[in-house]
Amino acid sequence: MIQVLLVTICLAVFPYQGSSIILESGNVNDYEVVYPRKVTALPKGAVQQKYEDAMQYEFTVNGEPVVLHLEKNKGLFSEDYSETHYSPDGREITTNPPVEDHCYYHGRIQNDADLTASISACDGLKGHFKLQGETYIIEPLKLPDSEAHAVFKYENVEKEDEAPKMCGVTQSNWESDESIKEDSQSNLTPAQQKYLNAKKYVKFFLVADHIMYLKYGRNLTTLRTRMFDTVNIVNQILQRINIHVALIGIEIWSKEDKIIVQSVPDVTLKLFATWRESVLLKRKNHDNAHLLTGINFNGPTAGLAYLGGICKPMYSAGIVQDHNKIHHLVAIAMAHEMGHNLGMDHDKDTCTCRAKACVMAGTLSCDASYLFSDCSRQEHRAFLIKNMPQCILKKPLKTDVVSPPVCGNYFVEVGEDCDCGSPATCRDPCCDAATCKLRQGAQCAEGLCCDQCRFKAAGTECRAATDECDMADLCTGRSAECTDRFQRNGQPCQNNNGYCYNRTCPTMNNQCIALFGPNAAVSQDACFQFNRQGNYYGYCRKEQNTKIACEPQNVKCGRLYCIDSSPAKKNPCNIIYSPNDEDKGMVLPGTKCADGMACNSNGQCVDVNRTY
């Protein structure tokens, strides 16, 4: 059995309180000096790691003893993590450095179950923790031949710019509070409930622009550490809504910027999102990317992101200004913008969390917390129910993982039976969190065919059919997995008004109802002739952002035209068009376009047997 190493470090408080000192976090007016003394007790035969899996720090703050428990953030990096920078002559240099034994930790104060600490132990101890509602920062003093560290309150750091920073999202066109409440509390379909219950992962890519490279002294290691410190906190914040953020790669524009980074945030966001879609996604598959920039945005803006953009090639992006020396404030801004990508709007005055300010507050203050408000949680849930973004459901298979397995990162890898997180957070009675092996007598730890650590009997229904294109799924009695079965693509459905396509029955009528409401229906054929125009209200596909007009036989595979029979809406040729998502309102692939014909993913009406 693998034993988790516990390291105890006593921090002796130096009998001195400083009045003012310049530290990495800025000019600090009041601080305490502490000296870490490390005491290690390795189990017999244990392998010494450079950075232990678990550590405990004991020290004194304002004369009161504090015990800080830390555990390595094992889910911080993805298994195929990569780093890219550029040589002086502009050559792209990409490496896959080992990241299993890293130095980034999450933690908590003893007798407080809430995770309130984020610490890096790479070069001394640097990070922050919360104690009795106050945010404290610890960092090395960098004195010659000394282990001295400073501990101080965030409020004692002199602020370079007292003007509060804000998010640039100002007009969301989001649903009303009532509709969100109805969506999140309404009866869910089996497919929606299955989606909500599934674990979710964001494979995250972070880019630093050239100004960041210059700002951190042209030192790749220093900038890399800044990026890691920031994402470590973002990961911790998003875990509160059951989103695991795995850093899949970083890129540093060390030679020059790959876009024109401007002080106008919406222009920079659009340029970055376009570069991500056209360049980065083709090079590195990921779910979401942000640009960390050293430029000062116009006004008080600290960041900007597309609302509800997650999983969309053009819109799963955000930009964040490196606006403060204290990285946890930059991390909160980044988590805020990712919150927008995940469907959350700004908090209103009526929104609450167990803190003075919640993550999605429109203004970033020194009271910023890691907590999402009741409104944010409701909006996020409603967004997931309505859109069910698929990319965040994907986690790697054992055979996909090429790096050594890391027990505790929530990914079941080669050599592991289960992975329920760290020993402190695991609540799975079937899984031994220390070894990632099943406990004695257990056959399984998770899966729809697993019940109280045992396989369900053969023939047990594990998933009901959701519609006529689905099939009831049965347990085999030999596995915890519930194999997903469904009707073959092309099977007629809904009284021959459609054909099954990837377990759904897409029809134009149902798509109109989803877009315009229960009184909507598909328009007459004449409306679809607009798809021969090749402009925003009528096209079949795009090539390099150019809209391609439909051929006559393909007009029903372009923009969807609907008629709304409501008294106030009598336009017979209604469409949905959004400049932020031009493909919204297009006829979905697999939709019936004629007898025996269905739309393919290229906007063509082809024989139903060739569509798939």
Swiss-Prot record:
GO MF term list: metal ion binding; metalloendopeptidase activity; peptidase activator activity; toxin activity
Binding site for Zn(2+): 336, 340, 346
Major localization class: secreted
Binding site for Ca(2+) 2: 470-471, 473, 484-485
Keywords: Apoptosis, Blood coagulation cascade activating toxin, Calcium, Cell adhesion impairing toxin, Disulfide bond, Fibrinogenolytic toxin, Fibrinolytic toxin, Glycoprotein, Hemostasis impairing toxin, Hydrolase, Metal-binding, Metalloprotease, Protease, Prothrombin activator, Secreted, Signal, Toxin, Zinc, Zymogen
Ways its activity is controlled: Inhibited by EDTA and EGTA.
Database matches in SUPFAM superfamilies: Blood coagulation inhibitor (disintegrin), Metalloproteases ('zincins'), catalytic domain
Residues in the signal sequence: 1-20
Name by which UniProt lists this protein: Zinc metalloproteinase-disintegrin-like HV1
